[in-house]
């Protein structure tokens, strides 16, 4: 059984001194994160990604669009936006590549290939370009992701909850596609999680965040509408050992994320200050839970997974 990533740590140490074998490759834990746009992987699961990479796991990130419809922070690259040159998507490939490198992941993977589906924009924005991901044929999209599951055979799959975290159409569609792919794939995914934000965890992070830039709008945890209460959460990953990697990845997404000088908070194009917590939370959708702590939470997404 897999406990606290101990097997991965041993394998990583052996590989560091030149010892490798097909059996070792089979024993390496594999985690797949499915996200809607470049930067989502970092904002919601960046600490977890870096945490497991540090422990020798094989981690892959699948991104469903290039984020072409995103707003751009600052003047330097503002004309890349959809209303000007419409070159933001290509630029965000470079940002995603740099962010993944900061997290320890080799390269991005795009569902259907880069640009196969376009960012749908928010629900109230016009459909200026097709094909939008929100309109993707479910059989095609889920089939492509199921093929990735069958090839990679992840022990853990992570995506959004049915509301897409905060309601973005592409996040909701990513949830639907991933859920359908997990059901369709021949590979039986041992554990399937939603990434969620904890009210208590964010409250703790708000309480300790300091030196927030004056130009950012400061809010409280009560102003954040999409948080989960503790009784709805199944797992927490302490990412304090990987927070520097997460902050570096955030800074790589410079057209989308501003990061405070001290790395304790960030803001998107809305300039609303949000703390960067040292924990990331999850809901277990399918699979057997591993050992739980006093709160009733797993502290390792791989807990209880048999790698053999």
Swiss-Prot record:
Reaction(s) catalysed by this chain's protein: 1D-myo-inositol 2-acetamido-2-deoxy-alpha-D-glucopyranoside + H2O = 1D-myo-inositol 2-amino-2-deoxy-alpha-D-glucopyranoside + acetate
Alphabetical list of InterPro entries matching this protein: GlcNAc_PI_deacetylase-related, LmbE-like_dom_sf, Mycothiol_biosynthesis_MshB
Record keywords: Hydrolase, Metal-binding, Zinc
Cofactor note: Binds 1 zinc ion per subunit.
Signal peptide: none
Essential cofactor(s): Zn(2+)
GO biological process, one term: mycothiol biosynthetic process
Function: Catalyzes the deacetylation of 1D-myo-inositol 2-acetamido-2-deoxy-alpha-D-glucopyranoside (GlcNAc-Ins) in the mycothiol biosynthesis pathway.
Family: Belongs to the MshB deacetylase family.
Protein name: 1D-myo-inositol 2-acetamido-2-deoxy-alpha-D-glucopyranoside deacetylase
Organism of derivation: Mycobacterium sp. (strain KMS)
Source lineage: Bacteria, Bacillati, Actinomycetota, Actinomycetes, Mycobacteriales
């Amino acid at each position: 059984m897999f406990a606290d990533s101990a097997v991965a740590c041993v394998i990583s140490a052996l590989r560091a001194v030149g010892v490798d074998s097909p059996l070792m490759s089979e024993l390496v834990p594999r985690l797949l994160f499915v996200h809607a746009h470049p930067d989502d992987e970092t904002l919601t699961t960046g600490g977890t990604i870096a945490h497991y990479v540090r422990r020798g796991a094989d981690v892959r990130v699948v991104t469903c669009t290039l984020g072409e419809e995103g707003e751009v922070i600052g003047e330097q690259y503002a004309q890349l936006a959809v209303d000007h040159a419409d070159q933001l998507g290509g630029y965000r490939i470079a940002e995603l590549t740099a962010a993944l490198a900061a997290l320890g992941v080799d390269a991005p993977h795009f569902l259907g290939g880069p640009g196969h589906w376009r960012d749908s924009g928010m629900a109230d924005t016009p459909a200026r370009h097709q094909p939008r991901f929100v309109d993707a044929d479910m059989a095609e999209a889920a089939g492509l992701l199921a093929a990735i599951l069958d090839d990679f055979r992840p022990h853990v799959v992570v995506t959004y909850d049915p509301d897409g975290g905060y309601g973005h159409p592409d996040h909701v569609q990513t949830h639907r596609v991933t859920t359908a792919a997990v059901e369709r794939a021949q590979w039986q995914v041992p554990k399937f999680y939603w990434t969620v934000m904890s009210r208590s965890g964010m409250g703790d992070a708000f309480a300790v965040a300091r030196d927030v830039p004056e130009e950012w709008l400061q809010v409280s945890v009560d102003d954040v509408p999409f948080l989960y209460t503790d009784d709805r959460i199944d797992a927490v990953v302490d990412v304090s050992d990987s927070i520097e990697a997460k902050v570096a990845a955030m800074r790589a997404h410079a057209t989308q994320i501003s990061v405070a000088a001290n790395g304790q908070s960030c803001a998107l194009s809305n300039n609303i200050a949000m703390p960067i917590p040292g924990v990331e939370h999850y809901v277990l959708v399918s699979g057997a839970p591993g050992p739980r702590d006093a709160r009733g939470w797993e502290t390792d997404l791989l807990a209880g997974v048999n790698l053999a």
